[in-house]
Structures are given as C-alpha cells and as structure tokens.
Amino acid sequence: MLIYDLTYEELEEFIVENGYKKFRADQIWNWLYKQKIEAFSEMNNIPEDIIKLLNDNYTFAGLETVIKNTSADGTIKFLFDLKDANLIETVLMSHNYGMSACVTTQVGCNIGCSFCASGVLKKKRDLTAGEIVAQIIRAEKESGVRVSSIVIMGIGEPFDNYKNFVKFISIVNHPKGLAIGARHITVSTSGLVPKIKEFAHLGIQVNLAVSLHAPNNEIRSKLMKINDRFKVEEVVDAIKYYIHVTNRRVTIEYIMIQDLNDSVETAVELAKLLKGMNVYVNLIPYNTVKEADYQRSSLENRLAFHKTLKEHKITAILRKEQGHDINAACGQLRSQNL
C-alpha cells in the first residue's frame, strides 16, 4: 500500500495502534508533504523502529517520469510510468493566480467521448487516492514550483472512481500537508447523474464542472456516448439539484468544434437551456487530436458564440489556449507512447 493512500487520521491511527505517540504522525506527515521525501530513511527525526515499521507496511508511489514537455506558454505536461507499467498524464498550467495541476484519476477511460484521445485507450483500472496524490508531489519536485490549485480533469471519469478521488481531496486539503483549499479544487464530470447528486451532499466546498458540450441530445450523443445513459435534460436537472443543495455555482464546460456546436443558433439554444441557473460557461478551444476528425472552432465563431451568450444574460468566458504545441489535450501524450 502507498503511504500517500493514508489520510492524516489513518496515519495517526496506525502510529498509535503500534504503540507510538500521536506526534510522530505529525512529524511523518510533515516529511511527506512539506519536505516531499521519497524514502522513509530520509526522516532524520524519526526513530529507526518506526522507519522499519513504515517500510514493512508502506511504499512510495515510485512514479517514473517518462516524458516532460514544456510549452511556450509555460504549460508543463508529464507522462508518468506507474509501478505496474501503466502510463498516466499530469499537466501543470501557469495562471496569474499561481500554478494549477490537472490530475488523472484512471488508467484509460470508458466514457468514450469522440473528440478525446483518452477514450481510444479503454480503462484498465482506477488509480488509488495515493497515486493521484503522487502526481502532485512528483510534478512539484520535477518543476520546482508549488501547486496552488487542482483540476481533476485528466484521463478518466472522476465520478467513476468516486471513493478514491474523494479521499484524494481530503489528503491534499489537509491543513498540515499540501493545504490546498477546497475552493481551489475543481472536479469535472461527463455527467454521471447519480454521482452528481451524491456529491451534492458531501459537504465540502469543491468546485463542480460538468462537461456538457452541446445544448441538445442530437449533438451531445455524437460527442459523448454517456449521453445514451444520461440525456441532456437529466444532466441539467442534476446540476439544478446540486445548485439547490449546495448553493454553489457550477461551471459548464463547452469544447467548441467547428461546424458542429459553435453556431449562433446553438448558442441561443444553450442560453435557453441554462436560463436562470447559477452557472457560468467555460468556452474551450478544441485541441485537435489525431484520433478524431474534428477541427477547432474559428475565432470568429467563438467570439460570436460568447457574445450571444452574454446577450442572453449567461455568464461565459473564452478560455485561454494552453499547451496546444505540446499535445496537452487529455490522453494525447499517453496514446502516442503505447
């Protein structure tokens, strides 16, 4: 078992159950998340018997960096090799408010979005909470920067690995560790309706983003197989439920694809669908991938779409393009190396 799989409370319980004082857990946690050690033997204020105990029961993630690409805009994309030889991706993105990490939750993905490179390689397994945590640790060490926010938007559907990604949040959010505030963490889902409703009752102030990408079932079904299970209307109802329970705004993710979902008429339809909801729309320039025969929406169309939403009183932003020159779209780097 990975040491990063333990919450602070679980580590404390383990230490106490083995006859040691609670403060030792505090020391170990500090070594893990402040000093970012990669071997228990590096903890020079921990007795040797505790180090032996840890070595006998836990391991480090052992992520090996296969590829590290840096974009002209400062985006850094990592391809990591797990201990079982599976490959995952992590991306660091530079913003004016700090460095954001986009983490992966699964090896492969079963959602099967037609525009995405991740779905070409089907899901092999879920990542543990510790394997998700390890991406942050490794990315920080490799880049020399501190991650101040997290987006759970890498390879995989987080709500299909619900228990582990929720545990991951509790670990990185702990004030004595990485201390990344809940409001600086965003989880993105393709629209697993039951899990959206369950997440509403979790009681943490993590941001929710929903990949909608279309205002109707005809277009969305072309883009996302998940729409065969959960129609647009069901997803929107789940979003309304989440907003009602949490009183929190939801981000609507909308990848703009030329001549498919980027017309002014489609923008009007989207505005009507979202009317009166506490949401904002994130308009995303499509990162072309060789696995899909789609093209990025023209700047003219993106601007017109954005203008139309604003005219209909829908808050929307045109997301800045990042990492296009290093294949930073989800799943691209992994698919090229398998």
UniProtKB/Swiss-Prot annotation:
Gene that encodes the chain: rlmN
Active site: 89 (proton acceptor), 330 (s-methylcysteine intermediate)
CDD domains: Radical_SAM
Binding site for S-adenosyl-L-methionine: 156-157, 188, 211-213, 287
Disulfide bonds: 102-330
Cofactor note text: Binds 1 [4Fe-4S] cluster. The cluster is coordinated with 3 cysteines and an exchangeable S-adenosyl-L-methionine.
GO cellular component: cytoplasm
Binding site for [4Fe-4S] cluster: 109, 113, 116
Top-level division of the source organism's lineage: Bacteria
Reported function: Specifically methylates position 2 of adenine 2503 in 23S rRNA and position 2 of adenine 37 in tRNAs.
Main location group: cytoplasm
Swiss-Prot/TrEMBL GO biological process terms: rRNA base methylation; tRNA methylation
Protein name: Probable dual-specificity RNA methyltransferase RlmN
GO MF term (any one): rRNA (adenine(2503)-C2-)-methyltransferase activity
Keywords associated with the record: 4Fe-4S, Cytoplasm, Disulfide bond, Iron, Iron-sulfur, Metal-binding, Methyltransferase, rRNA processing, S-adenosyl-L-methionine, Transferase, tRNA processing
Keyword Transferase among record annotations: yes
